[in-house]
Amino acid sequence: MKQESPTCPVEITMGLIGDKWKILIIRDLLTGTKRFGELRKSLNGISQKVLTNNLRDMEKSGLVHREAFAEVPPRVEYSLKETGWSLEPVLYSMVQWGNNYRELQK
């Protein structure tokens, strides 16, 4: 039986990117295509398993594109799909809000 999707747009968005790591993965991919190791290095404290699971979820949701190259050693690259890129203004708003909040805390 298929689970019913939420009707609230905020709930839908939070379901897709509400996880701490997902929003940070999107932040990093907004600067361009990255390999798994590059993402892992830039995300302090994330385990390999958690990064793998988040990337798989984001690929399944249509936010991230995974491209595997038939090379030795194997190479896999991740990039944002159009739906992922559409989150750029959301992250920009978060940056502005975070900067304003930081200033208020001084």
Across the structure, where does each feature detected by a protein language model lie?
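Amphipathic alpha-helical dimerization/coiled-coil segments
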Residues: 5, 9, 86-106
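Residues within the DNA-recognition helix of helix-turn-helix
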Residues: 54
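Conserved catalytic-core motifs of GNAT/GCN5-like acyltransferases
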Residues: 67
